[in-house]
């Protein structure tokens, strides 16, 4: 039964169906505005008085309405949760991407620092040199057995590791000087700590010597020990050491390692202890030792030109600071011209026609390229002089290819 009451307070009452029959429930309805004012005409009280049957019927109706509303709201809630989860997933993915990118950048930076730390131009020279020397004792394709390749890889690895030791120990000993001369090097720039660099040098040297000992080859073991001792004496700042500050001792170190150890120790190792043949010193080996020794002496002089500023600052008297950059450059270029002239004469005396032709044309070409490159050197620019030094390393690589045509 519906009863209507007029009341200015607009507080409708309803006999709520979920309560007991005969109870009264007051409902507060919102006021509306009409043209800026309250619409009082709609302010009425509504009271609903429910009987027992009416209460049951209304309750079922309300439940049905609630179920209908719930069904209608389910899709919205589902999509709302999905969108929220997607946003959370996107945020999580973005954080993961940032962390992944940051880790990748740090890893790549460290790997690049390690790459620079090994002085790759010298490492390439070692790979080319040892490979070339390993080929000299071969007499036929039948010598290229699996055992030969395995022994070659072991010897090459020991040489590369020792070469890297010499380059890294030099950087560990020259951190302060390199901050002036070569600020881009890993230790000088701070990309690697000195402790890390020292640990790497120890691992490199010990691993190289361990491989040599495992091969049980006296010439190889002897050569690597000499290489280790000279590399240490060249760089380490101890009494009677640090030979790099003396032009004669510095040149002697490079000549012995590149000109003699490379050639004879590794050649005898491959010829006697890998191929099982008696030791025979060949003409190409002698030629390689002579011309590589000359190029090595030149490189020991050239490398001091871009380092002159730092050497002066720390009180080191290099040959470049004594004679002047221009005189040292001229001396190096003339020494290489002389070596290539001798190489052309030796090649012309070869009985192997193809070897004669390749040797003459090859060394003449290298001499011509050297002359062209020397014209472009700017002695006032350290980057230019260092670039020329790296160019001489390329001549070093090229010579190891040409020695095989001298038969």
From Swiss-Prot:
Residues 1-81 form a transit peptide. The chain crosses the membrane at residues 121-141, 184-204, 209-229, 248-268, 279-299, 328-348, 352-372, 386-406. Signal peptide: none annotated. GO terms for molecular function: prenyltransferase activity. InterPro entries: UbiA_prenyltransferase (IPR000537), UbiA_sf (IPR044878). It catalyses: umbelliferone + (2E)-geranyl diphosphate = 8-geranylumbelliferone + diphosphate; esculetin + (2E)-geranyl diphosphate = 8-geranylesculetin + diphosphate. It is a multi-pass membrane protein. Expressed in leaves. Detected in the flavedo of lemon peels, but not in albedo. The keyword Metal-binding does not apply. GO terms for cellular component: chloroplast; chloroplast membrane. Its EC number is 2.5.1.138. This is Coumarin 8-geranyltransferase 1, chloroplastic. It comes from Citrus limon (Lemon). The gene is ClPT1.
């Amino acid at each position: 039964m519906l009863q209507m009451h007029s009341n200015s307070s607009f507080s409708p009452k309803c006999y709520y169906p979920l309560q007991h029959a005969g109870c009264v429930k007051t409902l507060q309805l919102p006021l509306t505005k009409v043209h800026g004012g309250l619409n009082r005409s709609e302010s009425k009280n509504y009271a609903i008085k429910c009987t027992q049957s009416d209460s049951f019927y209304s309750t079922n109706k309300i439940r049905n309405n609630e179920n209908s509303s719930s069904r209608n709201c389910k899709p919205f809630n589902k999509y709302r949760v999905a969108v929220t989860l997607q946003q959370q997933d996107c945020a999580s993915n973005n954080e993961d991407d940032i962390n992944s990118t940051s880790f990748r950048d740090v890893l790549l930076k460290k790997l690049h620092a390690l790459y620079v730390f090994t002085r790759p131009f010298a490492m390439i020279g070692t790979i080319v040199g040892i490979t070339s020397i390993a080929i000299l004792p071969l007499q036929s394709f039948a010598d290229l057995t699996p055992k030969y390749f395995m022994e070659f890889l072991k010897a090459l690895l020991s040489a590369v590791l020792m070469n890297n030791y010499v380059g890294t120990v030099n950087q560990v000993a020259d951190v302060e000087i390199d901050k002036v001369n070569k600020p881009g090097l890993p230790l000088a720039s701070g990309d690697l700590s000195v402790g890390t660099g020292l640990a790497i040098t120890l691992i490199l040297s010990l691993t190289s010597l361990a491989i040599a000992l495992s091969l049980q080859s006296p010439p190889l073991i002897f050569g690597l020990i000499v290489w280790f001792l000279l590399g240490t004496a060249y760089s380490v700042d101890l009494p009677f050491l640090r030979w790099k500050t003396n032009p004669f001792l510095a040149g002697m170190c490079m000549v012995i390692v590149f000109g003699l150890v490379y050639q004879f120790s590794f050649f005898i190792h491959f010829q006697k202890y890998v191929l099982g043949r008696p030791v025979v010193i060949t003409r190409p080996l002698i030629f390689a030792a002579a011309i590589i020794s000359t190029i090595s002496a030149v490189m020991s002089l050239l490398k001091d030109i871009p380092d002159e500023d730092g050497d002066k600052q720390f009180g080191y008297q290099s040959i470049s600071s004594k004679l002047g950059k221009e005189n040292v450059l001229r001396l190096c270029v003339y020494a290489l011209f002389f070596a290539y002239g001798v190489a052309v004469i030796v090649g012309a005396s070869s009985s192997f026609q193809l070897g004669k032709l390749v040797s003459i044309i090859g060394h003449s070409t290298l001499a011509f390229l050297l002359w062209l490159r020397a014209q472009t050197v700017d002695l006032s620019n350290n980057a230019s002089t260092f670039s020329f030094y790296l160019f001489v390393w390329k001549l070093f690589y090229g010579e190891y290819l040409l020695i095989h045509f001298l038969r």
